[in-house]
């Protein structure tokens, strides 16, 4: 999704109180990309400060989740201006505080590998 500052990121956000990782992932994709998805498996759990810049003064675990699209379509909203799909060779300018090229490549690899094993720091 295209952020308000013009950079791009995977849909995501903080897990809300009383939400599981699964339900929160599905909610965030709906809010930011307009898609109804089914979260099907965890790709990775990463320490944000080991993979993203700038570092935070506190620790955050980032959970990457593989989803299947069920329905829906994008509508501009308060968080995102646009939604699009990109191949690895055509990535736009990324919101590196949210996800970087290494993380996008990891997600592509997990999508294509039915035997993917969860990565974690």
Ranges and model annotations:
Residues 10-44, 65:
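The catalytic Nudix box helix
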Residues 46-73:
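Active-site-adjacent beta-strand/loop module that shapes the phosphate/pyrophosphate-binding cleft
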Residues 15, 69-70, 80, 91:
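Hydrophobic pocket-lining residues within nucleotide cofactor-binding pockets
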Residues 7-8, 78-121:
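Nudix hydrolase/Nudix homology domain
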């Amino acid at each position: 999704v295209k952020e308000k500052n013009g950079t791009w990121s995977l849909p995501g956000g903080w897990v809300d109180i009383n939400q599981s990782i699964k339900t929160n992932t599905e909610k965030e994709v709906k809010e930011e990309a307009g898609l109804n998805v089914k979260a099907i498996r965890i790709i990775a759990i990463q320490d944000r400060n080991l993979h993203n810049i700038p570092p935070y003064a506190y620790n955050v675990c980032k959970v990457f989740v593989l989803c299947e699209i069920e329905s829906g379509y994008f509508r501009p909203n308060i968080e995102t201006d646009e939604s699009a799909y990109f191949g690895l060779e055509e990535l736009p300018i990324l919101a590196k505080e949210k996800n970087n090229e290494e993380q996008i490549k990891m997600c592509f690899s997990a999508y294509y590998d039915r035997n993917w094993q969860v990565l974690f720091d």
